[in-house]
């Protein structure tokens, strides 16, 4: 099986598409499907690209380590749609919510909650989806978002044993040699 502990993010970048195709070909109808909720927006284009790389890493981790078919529109849609254009951003959000409706689990990844993530968490709560959080730092905020939706936080769980999914993009996609492999 694929060894997730990669020596650098470039290798992961080169394998993520193949791994996702493998994932789609070999998963059965019984394989859980999850929507990866993580930040996309950033102050710079480089930051957006790092967040896109991070979500692809989260998807690979979910497949390899959790046995979950993970989906995330922000892994690829920014190549086609401009997040700074309100019309295109809304289209991307609508595509994401349509994908979310087809999943049974919401994986809340990273160590912060963005505006787009708040909408995804609200929608998952309204739909009764299982919500898994990987960073204790954002757990209370996720629970508050669920409660704002008029629901209890019973569907929200913390899974700290998979701490890789709590790492921010700048740790997963390091600009120097120290990165995610140092914490795995």
Tell me the role of every PLM-derived stretch.
Residues 1-184:
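Conserved catalytic or regulatory cores that recognize and/or transform ribose-phosphate-containing ligands
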